[in-house]
UniProtKB/Swiss-Prot annotation:
Keyword Nucleus: no
SUPFAM superfamilies listed in its UniProt record: Zn-binding ribosomal proteins (SSF57829)
Keyword ATP-binding among record annotations: no
InterPro entries, per database record: Mitoribosomal_protein_bL33 (IPR052008), Ribosomal_bL33 (IPR001705), Ribosomal_bL33_sf (IPR038584), Ribosomal_zn-bd (IPR011332)
The protein's name in its UniProt record: Large ribosomal subunit protein bL33m
Organism: Tetraodon nigroviridis
GO molecular function, one term: structural constituent of ribosome
Biological process per Gene Ontology, one example term: translation
Family matches, as PANTHER family: 39S RIBOSOMAL PROTEIN L33, MITOCHONDRIAL, LARGE RIBOSOMAL SUBUNIT PROTEIN BL33M
Length: 65
């Protein structure tokens, strides 16, 4: 009997941590979770630098959760 090691594919997580950046150009950002299968997030949230609600766009993936 021969023992072999099987290379199994690593399972991907369902959620990922992404960085959301203000569209006002203030440099303000925050991190949030989203489902891996969804499209990129766009949220309307308060930006404390300009003290207004602005759009936040997903800039980059930080890590898998």
């Amino acid at each position: 009997m021969f023992l072999t090691t099987a290379n199994l594919a690593k399972a991907k997580s369902k959620t990922i941590l992404v960085q959301m950046v203000s569209a006002a150009g203030t440099g303000y950002f925050f991190n949030t979770k989203r489902n891996r299968l969804r499209d990129k997030l766009v949220l309307r949230k308060h930006d404390p630098v300009v003290n207004k609600h602005v759009l936040f766009f997903e800039k980059k993936k930080i890590r898998s959760i």
